[in-house]
Design a protein with these regions (language model features):
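Elongated, amphipathic alpha-helical interaction scaffolds
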Residues: 1-218
């Protein structure tokens, strides 16, 4: 399969998972994560909390397992409880990385130590290249398994191929269009429109600018 590489928003192209993780893994940024997940999954979140696994383990994981931006537990207004993981994937072993990441986020629940029941897990996988043959930029992958008469939990993974995203009216963007256009990268005029429409993207962009400024100063 031919993999066509295109650049994501340049604020995040250098080790995107690491940069996003440094910026977003704090209580102050939960609103940003919440807004992103609501836009991608088309849900309304009542409660959201960071799961501590990434922060606690990132220095001890092998490089091939040290991926992911955020690992959160959410409660929706429809009384659903689930874990959501978000990661960028590079162009190598894409399907393997998607499955490994899903497994990591789902099994992270063993680390909580607060007697919570296992909940459904969904992962959001961001690709800055074309990988699947489908034309749409967003793809939902579900894997159903059965063991005898017992139906095991459905695996659900979302993939978003940013280069496939197209928007033809930058003056009236939906929330998911705002996020995908921002992550894909856009001209300054479009960026300013997006930031005027979405305060969470505006905050993330400010934090990204601050991050790179501090990196240069160090």
């Amino acid at each position: 399969m031919e993999v066509k590489i295109e650049q994501v928003n340049r604020k995040f192209i250098s080790n995107s998972n690491y940069v996003f993780r440094k910026i977003l893994n704090s209580e102050d940024c939960l609103g940003i994560i919440k807004n992103f997940i609501e836009a991608i999954l088309d849900i309304k979140i009542k409660e959201i909390e960071l799961n501590p696994y990434l922060k606690q383990k990132e220095n001890y994981l092998p490089r091939e397992e040290n991926f992911g931006i955020a690992d959160v537990r959410i409660h929706t207004y429809e009384n659903e409880e689930m874990n959501v993981g978000i990661q960028f994937i590079d162009g190598i072993y894409v399907q393997t990385k998607m499955l490994m990441y899903y497994s990591q986020i789902h099994l992270n629940q063993l680390e909580y130590g607060d007697n919570r029941e296992f909940a459904k897990t969904i992962t959001i996988n961001l690709l800055d290249f074309n990988y699947f043959s489908s034309k749409g930029c967003k793809k939902t992958i579900r894997i159903k398994t059965n063991e005898g008469d017992v139906r095991l939990e459905e695996i659900e993974m979302i993939s978003i191929e940013l280069p496939k995203f197209r928007c033809y009216d930058n003056d009236d963007l939906t929330e998911i269009e705002q996020w995908l256009q921002y992550l894909k990268g856009c001209d300054e005029n479009t960026l300013e429109k997006i930031k005027s429409q979405n305060k969470y993207i505006k905050k993330l962009d400010t934090l990204a600018e601050k991050y790179w400024l501090e990196e240069k100063m160090e």
